[in-house]
Amino acid sequence: MKKTAKQIGAYGEDIAEKYLKKRFWRILSRNYLAHGKEIDIIGYRFGVLTYFEVKTRSNDLYGKPSDAVDYQKISNIRTCARDFLNTYRRGGRIPVFYPFGIEIPRKIYKQRIDVIEIYLSPDGEIREINHIKDWEKKL
């Protein structure tokens, strides 16, 4: 059975989350919604608060996955990011959860927007994962 774009997107986000956790990212939120906008994954590592846009492709018909992350999408992510910070930041820190439910407020030294491109084979196998840091600077 052929998967819908929404199913492929959710599968890609699952892959991205596992990829990030293996690289010691703390996942603060998935599919964070605010003002009708969404951030796929919000993560924290080594003082960097990162808003991840995950793009998954199973063919090359629409170009590279990152081609879909334009100025409008960046603007939407910024809108959500402001809401996230207004909701969770206290005294320049955000709560980061560790194993056994331990919450430690962590300082934010930098924020950025990254894109994670996921390329799948037609049968859904992972072909490639490409983590593009500081996507805004590449537009």
Stretches found by the model and what they are:
Residues 56-122:
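Catalytic cores of nucleic-acid endonucleases
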Residues 112, 117-139:
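Short, low-complexity, polybasic intrinsically disordered segments
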Residues 32-34, 56:
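Short, glycine/acidic-enriched loop or turn micro-motifs at the edges of active sites
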Residues 20, 41-61, 77:
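Conserved catalytic cores of phosphodiester-cleaving nucleases, focusing on short active-site segments
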Residues 1-31:
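Acidic-basic catalytic patches of nuclease active cores, encompassing PD-(D/E)XK
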Residues 35, 46-48, 123:
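Short strand-connecting beta-turns/loops that link adjacent beta-strands
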